[in-house]
Every structure is written in structure tokens, then in C-alpha cells.
Swiss-Prot record:
Source taxon at top rank: Bacteria
Record-listed E.C. numbers: 6.3.5.3, 3.5.1.2
Domain named Glutamine amidotransferase type-1: residues: 3-225
Active site residues according to the UniProt entry: 86 (nucleophile), 194, 196
UniProt keyword annotations, A-Z: ATP-binding, Cytoplasm, Glutamine amidotransferase, Hydrolase, Ligase, Nucleotide-binding, Purine biosynthesis
Protein name: Phosphoribosylformylglycinamidine synthase subunit PurQ
Subunit structure: Part of the FGAM synthase complex composed of 1 PurL, 1 PurQ and 2 PurS subunits.
PROSITE patterns recorded: GATASE_TYPE_1 (PS51273)
SMART domains: GATase_5
SUPFAM superfamilies named among the record's database cross-references: Class I glutamine amidotransferase-like (SSF52317)
Pathway stated in the Swiss-Prot or TrEMBL entry: Purine metabolism; IMP biosynthesis via de novo pathway; 5-amino-1-(5-phospho-D-ribosyl)imidazole from N(2)-formyl-N(1)-(5-phospho-D-ribosyl)glycinamide: step 1/2
Membrane-spanning residues: none
Organism expressing this protein natively: Bacillus subtilis (strain 168)
């Protein structure tokens, strides 16, 4: 399986994402600069965290107009896995690939520490290696991770089982403790915590590795045939 790591001006987690796939997962991965226009040949798309374009206007607002974004939307439409982490999640919201919006954290402070997440849905291609209700530890690093949506959207997310992860303890004011959601098809995931920073016990947790393993497992089941 071959992954693309989208690199935007201000990305700062692209190296971590590359390391998770290449060194820990053992799969192909390439950096794709924001000025590119094609993602042909890639099986999965990863949009890392950071402060794309300085987070001017609002987080992800300018990144949505990058040359590469139509190709990201096309990959999602084709059913390829698309993962957006932190700023990547905000970008997916700006693209209209995921619902909701991000507000400033409730205490108006930047939060950077490991947090407990609860797996709410183990039936997506991103979470199949977890168990529903499983408690995992993944670090966060954000100032605007307060997930917000209206009551109607929240009801739809719950009805469609689109809430992938919630916080064990609500750290930022997110509606219903939401830390990550998928689209209706289940092939696009946005999450504020950083799984790519939790792929080795030396870093304090390897719980994030299961997410990447889930992606590969699903891809193998749907693309690899045995004689």
C-alpha cells in the first residue's frame, strides 16, 4: 500500500506521519507538495497537523484552496482512505468532506499532552483493529480543537455511527466529547489527537499504530487476492 503525505506551508507533523508509515508500518509513503495536482498511484491520503498557511482567516480556510485539494476530494470520492489529523481535520471540514467546525479550546489555552480516548466505532477501516469501548492513549497538540456542530448534525452523526473517538475527559469543550468523526461512507476520518505520535512505546504509547494497521488491513482485504 502506498500513502501520500500532503505537505502544506506550515505543516509540522508531516515527518512524524512519514515515520509512522515508513518505519513503523513498513509501507510505501511519499511527500506530496501542495502545488501538485494529482494523487494518481496512491492508495491512501494523509493530511498532517501543523499551522497551514499560518492559520490565517481560520484554521484550514486557506489550505482548502491549495492545488492538491481537488485530488484529495477525488480520492475520497473514489473510496480511498483519507486521514486528517489536527489541522488536517480542520482542512477536511473546510473542504466539506467532514461535518462540524472547530472553535477555540474552552479555556482558550493550547493543550499539548497525552489524553485518553474511547473508541466508539470499531467498524470503520480506521478502527477495525480496536475494540468498541477500548481506552487508548494518544497525544493532542491544539488550540482550536473544540468540535462544534448543531443538534441536527449531532443527531445524524450518532444515528450513522460516525463518531469514531471521544475524549475520556473532555479537554477542550467539544460537543459530546467528540475527538474524531468519519464521513457517511466511512473512508474519511478526521481526528484532533495525533496517532502518528503514538506508534512506539518509547514515545509513551503505541496505541496509534493500530489505526494505521487497520487501514492497511482493510486495503489488503479489498485489493490483494491470493491464488
Amino acid at each position: 500500500m502506498k500513502f501520500a503525505v500532503i505537505v502544506l506551508p506550515g505543516s509540522n507533523c508531516d515527518i512524524d506521519m512519514y515515520h509512522a508509515v515508513k518505519d513503523e508500518l513498513g509501507h510505501e509513503v511519499e511527500y506530496v507538495w501542495h502545488e501538485e495536482t494529482s494523487l494518481d498511484g496512491f492508495d491512501g491520503v494523509l493530511i498532517p497537523g501543523g499551522f497551514s498557511y499560518g492559520d490565517y482567516l481560520r484554521c484550514g480556510a486557506i489550505a482548502r484552496f491549495a492545488n492538491i485539494m481537488p485530488a484529495v476530494k477525488q480520492a475520497a470520492a473514489e473510496g480511498k482512505p483519507v486521514l486528517g489529523v489536527c489541522n488536517g481535520f480542520q482542512i477536511l471540514q473546510e473542504l466539506g468532506l467532514l461535518p462540524g467546525a472547530m472553535r477555540r479550546n474552552k479555556d482558550l489555552k493550547f493543550i499539548c499532552r497525552p489524553v485518553e480516548l474511547i473508541v466508539q466505532n470499531d467498524e470503520t477501516l480506521f478502527t477495525a483493529s480496536y475494540e468498541k469501548g477500548e481506552s487508548i492513549t494518544i497525544p493532542v497538540a491544539h488550540g482550536e480543537g473544540n468540535f462544534y456542530c448543531d443538534d441536527e448534525t449531532l443527531a445524524t452523526l450518532k444515528e450513522n455511527n460516525q463518531i469514531a473517538f471521544t475524549y475520556g475527559s473532555n479537554i477542550n469543550g467539544s460537543v459530546s466529547d467528540i475527538a474524531g468523526v468519519v464521513n457517511e461512507k466511512g473512508n474519511v476520518l478526521g481526528m484532533m489527537p495525533h496517532p502518528e505520535r503514538a506508534v512506539d512505546e518509547l514515545l509513551g504509547s503505541a496505541d496509534g499504530l493500530k489505526l494505521f494497521q487497520s487501514i492497511v488491513k482493510n486495503w489488503r482485504e479489498t485489493h490483494v487476492t491470493t491464488a
